[in-house]
């Protein structure tokens, strides 16, 4: 098995699960105990990044290492778009996955990281199929629909996952001789367009992120066709993080069981405060 296939296979192992943002080892343990398949180590969760403004960068390596030492599940960490030096640092730390993330400030407005040069699998965001295929062509092993991180508002997440999946559906119905024109319109390599049309899905796993705050939110995007979810501020900005973490994990695993969803949604306390009017849209970064 080639390195690229190995990295894609590692990401496939997370399918059907929940990846949670954490800022301390104690939060990482809560996530692991709740059944998260991985954690994202950050100095600030997205809602705090949004509130504080300024330039947001890769987290302190010491924090990332403390989180890695505290749990047995995979640990991810974020780098700025285009900042391959930050990615080199994370690879040296032996993180399990690197997220080239629009939640952080953009380091290079012209180029994303060439992820094929790394042994660590990368996660990248996308709002549409063209964006997703361009990131895969650069070596991304997992795509997450962007949504709007740190808002608690699911609207952009549903918009983006629907856009990606509807464009894939349209590809599967296209004639072979139409695919080169589709590839040009998408701004994506023809070989990836052909593979996606043949598979009827992306050649890598597709998670949803940005605005997931309740078990029902998680069920919604899973029913729409997501392979799993990232939950950032929705856990540790809620009234009862342990309860929300466990409930969202259960809702993701059994997303089509309405009786279970009703049961795990009871008596959770207040969900994270939401933000609907945005001056800064993270999802517009790094298209």
Curated annotation (Swiss-Prot):
E.C. designation(s): 4.3.3.6
Disulfide bonds: none
Keywords: Lyase, Pyridoxal phosphate, Schiff base
Catalytic EC class: lyase
Single GO molecular function: pyridoxal 5'-phosphate synthase (glutamine hydrolysing) activity
Pathway stated in the Swiss-Prot or TrEMBL entry: Cofactor biosynthesis; pyridoxal 5'-phosphate biosynthesis
The keyword Lyase appears for this protein: yes
Reaction equations catalysed: aldehydo-D-ribose 5-phosphate + D-glyceraldehyde 3-phosphate + L-glutamine = pyridoxal 5'-phosphate + L-glutamate + phosphate + 3 H2O + H(+)
InterPro entries listed in its UniProt record: Aldolase_TIM, PdxS/SNZ, PdxS/SNZ_N, RibuloseP-bd_barrel
Keyword Lyase in annotation: yes
Binding sites annotated in the UniProt record for D-ribose 5-phosphate: 21, 150, 211, 232-233
Active site: 78 (schiff-base intermediate with d-ribose 5-phosphate)
Residues binding D-glyceraldehyde 3-phosphate, per UniProt: 162
Protein's GO biological process: amino acid metabolic process; pyridoxal phosphate biosynthetic process; pyridoxine biosynthetic process
UniProt function note: Catalyzes the formation of pyridoxal 5'-phosphate from ribose 5-phosphate (RBP), glyceraldehyde 3-phosphate (G3P) and ammonia. The ammonia is provided by the PdxT subunit. Can also use ribulose 5-phosphate and dihydroxyacetone phosphate as substrates, resulting from enzyme-catalyzed isomerization of RBP and G3P, respectively.
NCBIfam families, per the entry: PRK04180.1 (NF003215), pyridoxal 5'-phosphate synthase lyase subunit PdxS (TIGR00343)
Annotated family: Belongs to the PdxS/SNZ family.
Subunit field text: In the presence of PdxT, forms a dodecamer of heterodimers.
PANTHER family on file: PYRIDOXAL 5'-PHOSPHATE SYNTHASE SUBUNIT SNZ1-RELATED (PTHR31829:SF0)
Full protein name: Pyridoxal 5'-phosphate synthase subunit PdxS
Gene: pdxS
């Amino acid at each position: 098995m080639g390195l690229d296939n190995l990295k894609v296979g590692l990401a496939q192992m997370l399918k059907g699960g929940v990846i949670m943002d954490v800022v301390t080892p104690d939060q990482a343990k809560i996530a692991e105990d709740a059944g998260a398949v991985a954690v994202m180590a950050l100095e600030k969760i997205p809602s705090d990044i949004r509130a504080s403004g300024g330039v947001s960068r890769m987290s302190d390596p010491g924090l990332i290492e403390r989180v890695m030492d505290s749990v047995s599940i995979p640990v991810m960490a974020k780098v700025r778009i285009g900042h391959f030096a930050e990615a080199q640092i994370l690879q040296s730390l032996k993180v399990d996955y690197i997220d080239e993330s629009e939640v952080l400030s953009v380091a290079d407005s012209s180029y994303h990281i060439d992820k094929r040069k790394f042994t660590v699998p990368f996660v990248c965001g996308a709002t549409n199929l063209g964006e997703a295929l361009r990131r895969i062509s650069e070596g991304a092993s997992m795509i997450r629909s962007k949504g709007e991180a740190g808002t608690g508002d699911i609207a952009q997440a549903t918009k983006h996952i629907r856009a990606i999946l509807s464009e894939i559906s349209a590809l599967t119905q296209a004639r072979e001789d139409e695919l080169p024109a589709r590839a040009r319109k998408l701004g994506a390599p023809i070989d990836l367009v052909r593979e996606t049309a043949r598979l009827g899905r992306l050649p890598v796993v597709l998670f949803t992120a940005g605005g997931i705050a309740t078990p029902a939110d998680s069920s919604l995007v899973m029913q729409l066709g997501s392979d799993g979810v990232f939950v950032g501020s929705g856990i540790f900005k809620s009234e009862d993080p342990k309860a929300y973490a466990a409930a969202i994990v259960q809702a993701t695993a059994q997303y089509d069981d309405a009786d279970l969803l009703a049961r795990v949604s009871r008596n959770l306390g207040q969900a994270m405060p939401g933000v609907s009017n945005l001056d800064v849209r993270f999802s517009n970064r790094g298209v």
